[in-house]
Amino acid sequence: MSRSNRQKEYKCGDLVFAKMKGYPHWPARIDEMPEAAVKSTANKYQVFFFGTHETAFLGPKDLFPYEESKEKFGKPNKRKGFSEGLWEIENNPTVKASGYQSSQKKSCAEEPEVEPEAHEGDGDKKGNAEGSSDEEGKLVIDEPAKEKNEKGMLKRRAGDMLEDSPKRPKESGDHEEEEKEIAALEGERPLPVEMEKNSTPSEPDSGQGPPPEEEEGEEEAAKEEAEAQGVRDHESL
């Protein structure tokens, strides 16, 4: 009876073999439960399983002292994590893996809930730091890109200026040629008028004077009229 009473009295840190349905007797450690869990899990202990780093609430009937049951339940087993659990309970009984953080909320530590929050805060800080470093990296990457783009734009502008500069003399030369052609056309336009002026005396209908044959006929007619007038004057006498 005294032994059975002892089995029911476990304290935080005791090493045991814990039996769960569907699993062999597993190397485990008793963890102290918080006050909130004591009422809901009366007469039960929070157990941390070595190897798997999982936790469960078990009664005294499913717990067996490790040292007394080591020969009986400590035989090798093919279940995943069992061999690791046997090694941890012997060599590192106070192990606290990453998966054990959830059980730390119900462990012997008086500030279990603060630690995960601190870790989360650290994670956020790390995330922010990483984010800021990423942003800085982006800024650093963007600055050379901007410089390259600006240099590329300057090169393009310089190329455009070089391409435009030979075009401008061509355009000015084209304007000069066009002006010469216009001047030549303007110089050629008065020529037909001058030709017309020069050609008018040669035309028979210009009115400058009759041809020589007509002049001779007129002189003969004038002589005949003068002779006829003389005859008339003579007859009148």
From Swiss-Prot:
Q: Where is this cross-link: Glycyl lysine isopeptide (Lys-Gly) (interchain with G-Cter in SUMO2)?
A: K80
In this chain, the stretch annotated as Disordered covers 69-237
List compositional bias (Acidic residues) regions by residue number: 212-222
- UniProt-listed Gene3D superfamilies: 2.30.30.140
> Cross-link position, Glycyl lysine isopeptide (Lys-Gly) (interchain with G-Cter in SUMO)?
K80
Q: GO:BP terms for this protein?
A: cellular response to interleukin-7; chromatin remodeling; negative regulation of neuron apoptotic process; negative regulation of transcription by RNA polymerase II; positive regulation of cell division; positive regulation of transcription by RNA polymerase II; protein localization to nucleus
Phosphoserine occurs at: S132, S133, S165, S199, S202, S206, S236
Could you tell me where the Polar residues compositional bias lies? Answer: 91-106
Q: What is its main location?
A: nucleus
Give the UniProt subcellular location, in the record's own words: Nucleus; Cytoplasm; Secreted, Extracellular exosome
- Domains as described in the record: The PWWP domain harbors the heparin-binding sites and is responsible for DNA-binding, while the C-terminal region is essentially unstructured. The N-terminal region does not contain a typical signal sequence but is required for secretion. It also determines exosomal location.
Q: What is the protein name stated in its UniProt record?
A: Hepatoma-derived growth factor
